Amino acid sequence: SRINVEKFNEMIEYEKKKIKSYKEDAAIYLGYKLQSKYYIKKNYPNDIHLAVPYNIIINKDNVTSVLLEKLDMLPDKFVIKKNKLSGYTVIVDKNEKISYQEQKYKYSTGNLYEILTTMLRYDYDKNPEEQETDKMDLFLEEYVPVKEEFKFHCIHGRVIMIEHSLLNTGLSN
């Protein structure tokens, strides 16, 4: 089935208006992946399946302790994402490799630490004109094997392009 982009944008605008009634800046709220996941899970529990986020948040203040204390408790495969921005996804397979930015690295705690500290080095999404900074966090979620992927490219909360990729062939449109 085809996705009606105009209808999708209407739904997003409608949800932003609903959120504004109790949250001052809906655009910011919907810009955070983890908060968006909780919102979708709460409002569309039977319509949309999402990867389950683990209750682990990583930032540059706790990256070492998380790796030392939590890594052994995680399943063999899991995903790490930035809570904001796109394109920062790490797929960890503790039996084999770490995939990050289309590169494969041998799995080791040291390699994972290097990747995470690189991601967190640029952990502030800020306007240089403003004093406030918005700290960037990483979150962990379950690994869900998929054969195809949809990416919604948005500018100012509006979908401008939908990218569809077949992961087993590398084809996209």
What are these model-derived regions, one by one?
Residues 4-97, 102-127:
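A conserved helix-loop-beta module that forms one wall/lid of the active-site cleft
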Residues 97-173:
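Phosphate-binding site of ATP-dependent enzymes
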Residues 1:
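S-adenosyl-L-methionine
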